[in-house]
Amino acid sequence: MTDSPVLALTKDLISRQSVTPEDAGCQDVMIARLEALGFTIERMVFEDTTNFWARRGTQAPLFAFAGHTDVVPAGKLEHWHTPPFEPTEKEGYLYGRGAADMKGSLAAMIVATERFIAEHPDHQGSIGFLITSDEEGPFINGTVRVVETLMARDENIDMCIVGEPSSTEVVGDVVKNGRRGSITGDLTVIGTQGHVAYPHLADNPVHKSLLAIHALATTEWDKGNEYFPPTSFQIPNVQAGTGASNVIPGEFHVQFNLRFSTELCNERIVERVTQTLDQHDLNYDLKWTYNGDPFLTDTGALLDAVVDAVDSVNQTKPALLTTGGTSDGRFIARMGGQVVELGPVNATIHKVNECVKIDDLEKLTDMYQKTLENLLA
């Protein structure tokens, strides 16, 4: 039996070993399909990252699909039931690295757009595609660079669906209408190394830091709001000492991360952390990594169109959530437009035996097409 268009394209993309930041020809496949629809293509290669911006139309509003062709490494091959880059159908599922994150979404976007344009060749507004090979990596030369390029020429996306795997049980049961911000601090508290038998000749930075670290860990940063939970402070890494049991360390390294809501901003977090550390009279060095601001699409035409599209396919409305990690939506939101995430079930993403339900690919395509119809028909 011949594969459906979305299944065939998903298989083609999975078969290309596009481990971040490699694209492995995935974007060439997508570009060929979009050029046939009359899209203008702009390839943007920054350092080791392949990106493209495609647009059909010149009028407002500008609606865009966004996604990534790169995938995480497959891991230990012996743990896979089937080769990760040989797409395999089994009991109604399609297995392969990237099936859910997010080559299935990319295929659904392309096929939905083909169907929409076939029915509405003179559609309203404009359709765009913002695609990168650097979402799973350091996110330095990917979507953020494309966004900066577009903003510099005042070409701003009004509405965007990011194809991240947002769903939990069935496709479309969750739409992410926002994400928390993320900021990481790398703290080094400086003491004086010495022998544990002579503590008066040393200055233990671990002991000096504990009260400050406890204060940060127990701080109520905010109460959250109707869209976001309270800000979370977590310590993923600590390091001190030489490994010897008789040496007081000279330095204590603590890495912490805050996932924060729209109730906070980077500047306020830095200010409060610095105040806490200074109150405990520490000699320290603190470096910050800004991973992204929170964003929220609480109302608007895009959200209405997506909710209606999901409801038309599933006969039930999706939950609107802001949970989970960061995504490239945080960069696109800088343009000031509406951004949501809608994609496959995320139960197997980044795992061995990653898979997507084949029927879900068809449903996701229908949801994307219906969204286009709601906005631009």
Swiss-Prot record:
CDD domains: M20_DapE_proteobac
A biological process from GO: L-arginine biosynthetic process
EC number: 3.5.1.18
Cofactors required: Zn(2+); Co(2+)
Pfam families (alphabetical): M20_dimer, Peptidase_M20
Keywords of the record: Amino-acid biosynthesis, Cobalt, Diaminopimelate biosynthesis, Hydrolase, Lysine biosynthesis, Metal-binding, Zinc
Residues bound to Zn(2+) 1: H68, D101, E164
Co-factor note (free text): Binds 2 Zn(2+) or Co(2+) ions per subunit.
Molecular-function GO terms, alphabetical: acetylornithine deacetylase activity; cobalt ion binding; succinyl-diaminopimelate desuccinylase activity; zinc ion binding
The organism's place on the tree of life at top rank: Bacteria
Assembly notes: Homodimer.
Protein name, entry field: Succinyl-diaminopimelate desuccinylase
Organism name: Vibrio vulnificus (strain YJ016)
